[in-house]
């Protein structure tokens, strides 16, 4: 007891007496000032600046004069080391953090009980925790001010705001009251909230958010569902994706052609035998025979069409040939008179310049089947006197013989 009193006296001598009394009465003044802060809507709505100034006034000598007597009573009943003074003053966040958004003020809340090392300060620690909770609600965890202080639960005030921000504080609080997992929304990155890299609570929240994202992706929000894959497989089976073509060897093709020449249709036992001997499946043999039959039918049909066209051409050619022969026979029948007239014209021109002997030879050659009378009659004008018959007596050409 003596050591503690001497330690307290030495600590009090380091500062002025009125300030020492005010610092000892700081916890009670802090509790009363922070408890009255949320009731005033003007302070709560103004953000963290007004509350920090009011809290700083509670540590100033001006507010310590009104509460000097309760401070002496508290000092006499529960002595505490001067470390508690710095702890209570450390409950309030720094103005730099408040200007950035007030995210670090709540982070200091859970860390403050670790500063209390004396076992006799349990009541002061409880009061400090309540003051920190009230201060976190009054200061607000984001620029919402009074909305954030009125709507957020006590857990968010004690453990600090997670990395993921809320679009609407009231809706987030309502969702958080219904289900704890719904209080975490998808991340909306904001630079106004300084996140401590070594904060285990925020790292846990990030891990939980990653787990939620993985579950949502596997549920079908990002990855395609299994029915999509099954529908693609069904569409491929319907004919969009063709199977690879079977490559038969020359020996297999020869044997298949031989079997096809023997029989165009294979029975089931024969098909099994051929497939086993050629190391093929029955389906491959069946499909090959189907394709070969279609090819054979096409070639057969093409041959039949070619034969029909040839017959048609022969029929049209035969009719044209018959007509030509008839025309030739008519020309042959009508031809000799025409040729005779032409020949007679030529003969009349030739007789004027040719000898009578040659004319007789030509006439005999031209009419081989005529008798001599006809020949002489035809050439009577051009015949000689020796060949002509003697004139009758008393005729026009009779001349008396000289005596």
From Swiss-Prot:
CDD domains: homeodomain. Residues 355-365 have a biased composition (Acidic residues). One of its GO terms (cellular component) is nucleoplasm. GO terms for molecular function: DNA-binding transcription repressor activity, RNA polymerase II-specific; sequence-specific double-stranded DNA binding. The modification Phosphoserine is found at residues 78, 80. It is found in: Nucleus. SUPFAM superfamilies: Homeodomain-like. PANTHER family: MOTOR NEURON AND PANCREAS HOMEOBOX PROTEIN, MOTOR NEURON AND PANCREAS HOMEOBOX PROTEIN 1. This is Motor neuron and pancreas homeobox 1. It comes from Rattus norvegicus. The gene is Mnx1.
